[in-house]
Amino acid sequence: DYCRAHGIEVVGFCPIGSPERPERDKMPEDIADIELPELKAIAAAHGVHPAVICIKWAVQRGASPIPFSLKEKNYTMNLKCVTEDPLTEEEMETIRSLDKNNRLIKGHVFLWEGAKDWHDLWDEDGVIVK
């Protein structure tokens, strides 16, 4: 909401969270959104992979996700998903309700000298720390 109010374009880098990321970046409590039963059910109803639903949800919210893939069929599916078969308001609300502020890419590899852990990279409470 803040970004929209100030004309800032929201870009979702790695919007699926890279469930297949390296072991060094995984934590036991991590949950990949594409594995959530509610998201899988919505994906099944649309006949697509749960990752496509995540991209569709981001675009319908006004964000510009940047999904990664090495496969041409996924690029095509990602492009088609934002122009066809929109999510219903009920589906949008269901997905919104799943938010647990979970990050699969926490940024361990981006920590600077002196940083304690990945929490130093994020404004988890909405307060920017300088």
Residue map of PLM features:
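Beta/alpha (TIM)-barrel catalytic core signal, keyed to glycine-rich beta->alpha loops juxtaposed to Asp/Glu
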Residues: 1-130
